[in-house]
Protein backbone atom coordinates (compact mmCIF):
# COMPACT_ATOMS: atom_id res chain seq x y z
CA UNK A 1 0.00 0.00 0.00
CA UNK A 2 1.33 3.47 -0.80
CA UNK A 3 0.15 6.99 -0.34
CA UNK A 4 -0.79 9.08 -3.38
CA UNK A 5 -1.50 12.80 -3.44
CA UNK A 6 -4.87 14.15 -4.56
CA UNK A 7 -5.45 17.55 -6.08
CA UNK A 8 -6.98 18.89 -2.87
CA UNK A 9 -4.06 17.66 -0.76
CA UNK A 10 -5.96 14.71 0.64
CA UNK A 11 -4.06 11.51 1.13
CA UNK A 12 -5.68 8.23 0.32
CA UNK A 13 -4.43 4.68 0.64
CA UNK A 14 -4.04 2.93 -2.69
CA UNK A 15 -2.78 -0.63 -3.34
CA UNK A 16 0.73 -0.81 -4.80
CA UNK A 17 0.66 -2.45 -8.22
CA UNK A 18 4.32 -2.99 -9.15
CA UNK A 19 3.38 -4.52 -12.53
CA UNK A 20 1.45 -1.46 -13.71
CA UNK A 21 3.78 1.55 -14.35
CA UNK A 22 2.74 5.14 -13.79
CA UNK A 23 1.27 7.13 -16.66
CA UNK A 24 4.30 9.45 -16.59
CA UNK A 25 6.67 6.51 -16.93
CA UNK A 26 4.66 5.15 -19.86
CA UNK A 27 4.87 8.50 -21.64
CA UNK A 28 8.65 8.69 -21.08
CA UNK A 29 9.13 5.17 -22.46
CA UNK A 30 7.00 5.94 -25.53
CA UNK A 31 8.91 9.17 -26.19
CA UNK A 32 12.28 7.47 -25.87
CA UNK A 33 11.16 4.68 -28.21
CA UNK A 34 10.09 7.25 -30.79
CA UNK A 35 13.50 8.96 -30.70
CA UNK A 36 15.50 5.72 -30.76
CA UNK A 37 15.89 3.98 -34.14
CA UNK A 38 14.73 0.39 -34.22
CA UNK A 39 18.16 -0.97 -35.09
CA UNK A 40 19.69 0.43 -31.89
CA UNK A 41 17.26 -1.36 -29.64
CA UNK A 42 18.67 -4.49 -28.14
CA UNK A 43 17.04 -7.85 -28.46
CA UNK A 44 16.29 -8.15 -24.76
CA UNK A 45 13.11 -6.37 -23.65
CA UNK A 46 13.51 -3.63 -26.31
CA UNK A 47 15.85 -1.63 -24.11
CA UNK A 48 18.34 0.88 -25.42
CA UNK A 49 22.03 0.00 -25.24
CA UNK A 50 24.28 2.22 -23.19
CA UNK A 51 26.46 4.70 -25.06
CA UNK A 52 29.63 2.76 -24.45
CA UNK A 53 28.16 -0.34 -26.07
CA UNK A 54 26.75 1.13 -29.26
CA UNK A 55 27.41 -1.18 -32.18
CA UNK A 56 30.41 -0.16 -34.23
CA UNK A 57 30.32 -0.06 -37.99
CA UNK A 58 33.97 -1.02 -38.31
CA UNK A 59 34.21 -4.05 -36.08
CA UNK A 60 31.69 -6.86 -35.91
CA UNK A 61 30.03 -7.50 -32.59
CA UNK A 62 31.16 -10.65 -30.83
CA UNK A 63 30.22 -12.13 -27.52
CA UNK A 64 33.01 -12.20 -24.96
CA UNK A 65 31.83 -15.33 -23.16
CA UNK A 66 32.19 -17.59 -26.20
CA UNK A 67 34.97 -20.15 -26.00
CA UNK A 68 37.34 -20.48 -28.93
CA UNK A 69 38.04 -23.94 -30.26
CA UNK A 70 41.76 -23.84 -31.04
CA UNK A 71 41.70 -27.22 -32.71
CA UNK A 72 39.85 -25.68 -35.67
CA UNK A 73 42.38 -22.86 -35.90
CA UNK A 74 45.63 -24.84 -35.83
CA UNK A 75 47.26 -25.53 -39.20
CA UNK A 76 48.27 -29.10 -38.39
CA UNK A 77 46.03 -32.14 -37.89
CA UNK A 78 44.56 -32.70 -34.47
CA UNK A 79 45.98 -36.23 -34.31
CA UNK A 80 49.42 -34.70 -33.77
CA UNK A 81 48.16 -32.90 -30.69
CA UNK A 82 46.43 -35.85 -29.10
CA UNK A 83 49.22 -38.34 -29.86
CA UNK A 84 52.60 -36.72 -30.59
CA UNK A 85 54.39 -40.10 -30.65
CA UNK A 86 52.41 -41.41 -33.57
CA UNK A 87 54.36 -41.75 -36.79
CA UNK A 88 53.40 -39.60 -39.76
CA UNK A 89 51.01 -41.17 -42.26
CA UNK A 90 53.81 -41.61 -44.80
CA UNK A 91 55.66 -43.99 -42.47
CA UNK A 92 52.47 -45.84 -41.57
CA UNK A 93 51.66 -46.50 -45.21
CA UNK A 94 55.23 -47.19 -46.34
CA UNK A 95 57.28 -48.69 -43.47
CA UNK A 96 60.30 -49.21 -45.72
CA UNK A 97 61.02 -45.49 -45.38
CA UNK A 98 61.97 -46.22 -41.78
CA UNK A 99 64.61 -48.68 -42.96
CA UNK A 100 66.05 -46.09 -45.35
CA UNK A 101 66.29 -43.52 -42.58
CA UNK A 102 67.76 -46.07 -40.18
CA UNK A 103 70.51 -46.98 -42.67
CA UNK A 104 71.19 -43.33 -43.42
CA UNK A 105 71.43 -42.58 -39.70
CA UNK A 106 73.97 -45.37 -39.17
CA UNK A 107 76.04 -44.19 -42.14
CA UNK A 108 76.03 -40.62 -40.85
CA UNK A 109 76.90 -41.72 -37.32
CA UNK A 110 79.91 -43.70 -38.60
CA UNK A 111 81.08 -40.70 -40.62
CA UNK A 112 80.69 -38.44 -37.60
CA UNK A 113 82.65 -40.84 -35.40
CA UNK A 114 85.48 -40.87 -37.94
CA UNK A 115 85.47 -37.07 -38.14
CA UNK A 116 85.49 -36.76 -34.35
CA UNK A 117 88.49 -39.09 -34.16
CA UNK A 118 90.30 -36.81 -36.62
CA UNK A 119 89.23 -33.65 -34.82
CA UNK A 120 89.59 -35.09 -31.31
CA UNK A 121 93.37 -34.68 -31.09
CA UNK A 122 93.35 -30.99 -32.13
CA UNK A 123 90.58 -30.29 -29.59
CA UNK A 124 92.64 -31.89 -26.82
CA UNK A 125 95.73 -29.94 -27.90
CA UNK A 126 93.67 -26.77 -28.03
CA UNK A 127 92.43 -27.28 -24.47
CA UNK A 128 95.96 -28.16 -23.33
CA UNK A 129 97.33 -24.97 -24.87
CA UNK A 130 94.63 -22.96 -23.12
CA UNK A 131 95.48 -24.58 -19.81
CA UNK A 132 99.07 -23.35 -20.15
CA UNK A 133 97.70 -19.82 -20.13
CA UNK A 134 97.00 -20.25 -16.44
CA UNK A 135 99.85 -17.89 -15.70
CA UNK A 136 98.09 -15.16 -17.64
CA UNK A 137 95.18 -14.94 -15.24
CA UNK A 138 93.84 -11.67 -16.55
CA UNK A 139 93.20 -13.01 -20.05
CA UNK A 140 92.28 -16.56 -19.16
CA UNK A 141 88.50 -16.09 -18.58
CA UNK A 142 88.13 -14.16 -21.83
CA UNK A 143 90.12 -16.61 -23.90
CA UNK A 144 88.43 -19.64 -22.33
CA UNK A 145 84.96 -18.25 -22.88
CA UNK A 146 85.75 -17.35 -26.49
CA UNK A 147 87.28 -20.72 -27.25
CA UNK A 148 84.42 -22.66 -25.70
CA UNK A 149 81.93 -20.44 -27.49
CA UNK A 150 83.62 -21.23 -30.81
CA UNK A 151 83.59 -24.95 -29.99
CA UNK A 152 79.92 -24.73 -29.04
CA UNK A 153 79.06 -23.00 -32.31
CA UNK A 154 80.94 -25.64 -34.30
CA UNK A 155 79.15 -28.47 -32.49
CA UNK A 156 75.81 -26.75 -33.01
CA UNK A 157 76.48 -26.46 -36.74
CA UNK A 158 77.47 -30.11 -36.81
CA UNK A 159 74.22 -31.16 -35.14
CA UNK A 160 72.19 -28.98 -37.51
CA UNK A 161 73.85 -30.63 -40.49
CA UNK A 162 73.17 -34.08 -39.04
CA UNK A 163 69.54 -33.17 -38.40
CA UNK A 164 69.11 -31.94 -41.96
CA UNK A 165 70.71 -35.06 -43.39
CA UNK A 166 68.53 -37.35 -41.28
CA UNK A 167 65.14 -35.76 -41.63
CA UNK A 168 65.25 -34.08 -45.03
From Swiss-Prot:
One of its GO terms (cellular component) is membrane. It comes from the Eukaryota. It is found in: Membrane. Residues 13-22, 35-48 have a biased composition (Polar residues). Residues 1-63 are annotated as: Disordered. It is a multi-pass membrane protein. Residues 1-11 have a biased composition (Basic and acidic residues). The chain crosses the membrane at residues 119-139, 148-168. Residues 49-63 have a biased composition (Low complexity). Keywords: Membrane, Transmembrane, Transmembrane helix. This is Transmembrane protein 31. It comes from Homo sapiens (Human).
Amino acid sequence: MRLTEKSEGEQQLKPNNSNAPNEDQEEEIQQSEQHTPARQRTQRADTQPSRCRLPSRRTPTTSSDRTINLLEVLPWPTEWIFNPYRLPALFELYPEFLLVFKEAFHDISHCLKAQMEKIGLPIILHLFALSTLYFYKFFLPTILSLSFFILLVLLLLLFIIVFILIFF
